[in-house]
């Protein structure tokens, strides 16, 4: 019912996360007001799930500069009420949908955090190590996902080649018209090179 995102990259810092500008201001109730902008957020906004939980790295006002002062925050798209039901919209908005080559099925967004309510996860100033613990698993997951997609593409191609008839080959004894395309040498070569 809910989905999640990882919000690291900002317009001012790509790989140098120590330069991030997103701020976290502690409130009297223990929550934080998160303000800043994140870019390249996969599935950053969509209406397929009831809520989106954003994991956001930000710097608390009294934290040191650089990567040693980064904390991790849970920032929901919608505030969750005490009874677990969905409450009002949080201060998270979509600035734009990214226009990157090859992205057609993913709402990769620019997200704006405007005094959004956030909840610190884990110890203060340890957010980067927490985020990268999760990201290390995600790197493996993305690789396995790519392997799965390529495997099903290959299997579907072989199935189709065994069902589709087109033209005649010289190495079959079929007399009833066209041959299955898997009998064609170039199709077999293409399948071997997939």
Locate predicted features.
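Gly/Pro-rich turn-and-neighbor structural signature
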Residues: 1-32, 39-40, 184-194
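Core alpha/beta catalytic barrel or barrel-like domain that forms the active/cofactor pocket
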Residues: 2-10, 71-72, 164-174
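Beta-sheet entry/capping signal
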Residues: 3-5, 30-32, 53-55, 69-73, ...
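Short Gly/Pro-enriched turn/cap motifs at secondary-structure boundaries
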Residues: 12-15, 45-47, 64, 100-106
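Alpha-helical interface subdomain recognition
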Residues: 16-17, 27-28, 112, 140-194
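Short beta-strand elements
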Residues: 18-25, 57, 111, 115
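A short core secondary-structure module
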Residues: 31, 35-89
